[in-house]
Amino acid sequence: MFDSPSNEELSRTLAEPEEPIIDFSHVSIAFDGRPVLEDVSFYVNRGQTLCILGRSGVGKSVALRMLMGFLKPDEGSIRIEGQEITTLSEEGMRAIRKRITMVFQNGALFDSLSVRENVAFPLRERGDLNEEQVQELVDRLIGLVGAEDVVDVLPSSLSTGRKRAVAIARALAAQPEVVLYDEPTTMVDPIIARHLGDLIQRLKQKLGFTSIVVTHDMRFAERLADLVLFLHQGRAQFFGPLKGFMASQDPHIRQFLALDAYVLPSELGDSPLVTRA
């Protein structure tokens, strides 16, 4: 005989699901009268990775910029940890950006500062750490991305892949709950893309943050995604688990998958991120 569940156990079973950390609901935005995103909805639960896929110009990066508060939607709701951000002032968004950060395509590193000083910059801006604590955290972050050998060099001497790894370290200095990545594999070869994917996945598992990754690289997305949002002509053609996306018979999705140039993991080898892209 099985024991009957207690009232407490039943309450836990029937409880409302956890509120998504990101809730992007019926969002539309147009530039100069041209629709960029139309009625797009998705959500991400804490600890998940969402990959936003689609061809160039479909509004993938625009979605990230709205999550950061750099752009305001014309219609719809954007909530981060239950807080509506579309009506916040710039001061209110600065508070939100302590919990959500973005790794830009170009890395947005300071060319005049060494790798160490780039990573230290946001830590010093916090204002609650002494210099010894700053340097301890810098060493830890640089170690997490495997950049110990380039701490004293300027970003201009780094490969594209190494710049992106350093940019990730700097983004993590804010101890964010959500990390947004804008096309992290653009202008890198498949080997470096693989290692960037491994790095992002390893950091997520170690630190537990939520990730949203914009990419057109399906092989990269397969390594990372719990959820997929596929955009076509500014509309959400698919939102759901990776497995469902791969099995979809939607003609636009099948065309996207057919056009993607796959490189099998077995072909990539084990080249480190120090390889110049």
Predicted regions: what they are:
Residues 154-158, 162:
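Conserved ABC ATPase signature
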Residues 175:
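Conserved catalytic motifs of ABC-family nucleotide-binding domains
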